[in-house]
């Protein structure tokens, strides 16, 4: 099997998961796609990959690192400032009567979480990873993962407490 075929196979298997990770870090669909593409390009050009663990975890770690690098960058800070400045002016005019389903509301609440509790919530509940797997992936103690999950749930509870969930009335 050629390198190109191997890369295509890796992309077919892992793109969706890596995209979700990148999106939950960046909150931007196009940027998440770009980051995942960059991860695969970087992996392809690595001449010395040593298989020490699971490929899924290795690519996830590359994606997380790329996202964190971007979030530290000047480009990100400049775009964030511009977005906040200009959307505040528009948001006064924007009417919040747009209906959204519960999943959209929950996804948005997750995206509002600070990065550390958000990544724990995403990996545990959306990626269905164990606390041990999350600890290994993020290179932190299991107790820290539990603390971040607890903090994330507390913040979500506060954020979502005033929403009347339709699903509660269909039973």
Q: What annotation goes with each model-predicted range?
A:
Residues 15, 19, 40, 114, ...:
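C-terminal flanking helix
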Residues 28, 130, 139-144:
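Helix-turn-helix DNA-binding motif, specifically the short coil turn and the N-cap/start of the second
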Residues 120-124:
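A short pre-motif secondary-structure segment
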